[in-house]
């Protein structure tokens, strides 16, 4: 199993690479790519960690060597948020980066599963889909927007509030990966109940958690370490499913039946070919139903922005 990380010299990429080097199954290959010249050195640094995961690093404009034979490609390349920016302010720079890298994936490893981490995910996934479609290699079961950070944050905040072990809590999060489009389904957390005020406050905190980190880092960056952990969790789940493990479920932002929007984050059963089944979002509370209806315009606009970027 070969996993490629594109954007591997950045804050998210390095954290992700470290976690994959220590947690990928024995015999896996990990390839790191970034435009930055330090990237081969990041791979050498990680190669000293005693795990049976082969690692190589590549830098420069061309990601081909890193992508050859990749089964999973995780893309975290791009610029990070600064205070006062929201994820959509990143669009102007990151859209071009994602387009370029996905073109290279389409050419070199068209059958790979692709996880897009680069923000704004609501839009960059649409860009990736259109690029793959133009290349004639788009498979909607193999393209994912990685929203796992919203899930791990939800799990953490709910566990803190309710005095639970974080590992015991699993909150499904649907919609998108920015602001109001992030919708934690708190009504579906087993064995935990919330007041209306708690639901409103928690939902808002989960939606704004990225900003919480950006502000706390005082201009020095955005959520890189927790995002690295979230991306590793998703990537490792995907690897387990591709290797035949049954019953692997993760939420991610994928193209579905278009019931809510062309792309939508929902629980997915993963399998040997990527998405095996898009699971139902279940019964929503009145608060959640209202929030879902209220976000769709924003989500659809985000998606259209990505489609237009490629097709203009």
Curated annotation (Swiss-Prot):
It comes from the Bacteria. GO terms for molecular function: L-malate dehydrogenase (NAD+) activity. Belongs to the LDH/MDH superfamily. MDH type 1 family. Keywords: NAD, Oxidoreductase, Tricarboxylic acid cycle. SUPFAM superfamilies: LDH C-terminal domain-like, NAD(P)-binding Rossmann-fold domains. Homodimer. The keyword NAD applies. NAD(+) binds at residues 7-13, 34, 94, 117-119, 227. Its EC number is 1.1.1.37. Catalyzes the reversible oxidation of malate to oxaloacetate. GO terms for biological process: malate metabolic process; tricarboxylic acid cycle. InterPro entries: L-lactate/malate_DH, Lactate/malate_DH_C, Lactate/malate_DH_N, Lactate_DH/Glyco_Ohase_4_C, Malate_DH_AS, Malate_DH_type1, Malate_DH_type1_bac, NAD(P)-bd_dom_sf. The gene is mdh. NCBIfam families: MDH_euk_gproteo. PROSITE patterns: MDH. This is Malate dehydrogenase. Substrate binds at residues 81, 87, 119, 153.
């Amino acid at each position: 199993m070969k996993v490629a990380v594109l954007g591997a010299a950045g804050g998210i990429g390095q954290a992700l690479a470290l976690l994959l080097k220590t947690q990928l199954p024995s015999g896996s290959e990990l390839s790191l790519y970034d435009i930055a010249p330090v990237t081969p050195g990041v791979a050498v640094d990680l190669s000293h960690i005693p795990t049976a995961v082969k690692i190589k690093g590549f830098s420069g404009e061309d990601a081909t060597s890193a992508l050859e034979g990749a089964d999973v490609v995780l893309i975290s390349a791009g610029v990070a948020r600064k205070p006062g920016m929201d994820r959509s302010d990143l669009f102007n720079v990151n859209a071009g980066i994602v387009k370029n890298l996905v073109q290279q994936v389409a050419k070199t490893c068209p059958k790979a599963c692709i996880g897009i981490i680069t923000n704004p995910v609501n839009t960059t996934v649409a860009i990736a889909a259109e690029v793959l479609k133009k290349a004639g290699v788009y498979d909607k079961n193999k393209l994912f927007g990685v929203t796992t950070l919203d899930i791990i944050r939800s799990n953490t905040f709910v566990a803190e509030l309710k005095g639970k072990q974080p590992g015991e809590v699993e909150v499904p999060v649907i919609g998108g990966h920015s602001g109001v489009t992030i919708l934690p389904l708190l009504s579906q957390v087993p064995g935990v109940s919330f007041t209306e005020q708690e639901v409103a406050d928690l939902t808002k905190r989960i939606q704004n958690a990225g900003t919480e980190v950006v502000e706390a880092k005082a201009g020095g960056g955005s959520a890189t370490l927790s995002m690295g952990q979230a991306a590793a969790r998703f990537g490792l789940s995907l690897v387990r499913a591709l290797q035949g493990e049954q019953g692997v479920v993760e939420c991610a932002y994928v193209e579905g039946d278009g019931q809510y929007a062309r792309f939508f984050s929902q629980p997915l059963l993963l399998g040997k070919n990527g998405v095996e089944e898009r699971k139902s979002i279940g019964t929503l509370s009145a608060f959640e139903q209202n929030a879902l209806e209220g976000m769709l315009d924003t989500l659809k606009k985000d998606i259209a922005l990505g489609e237009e970027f490629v097709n203009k």
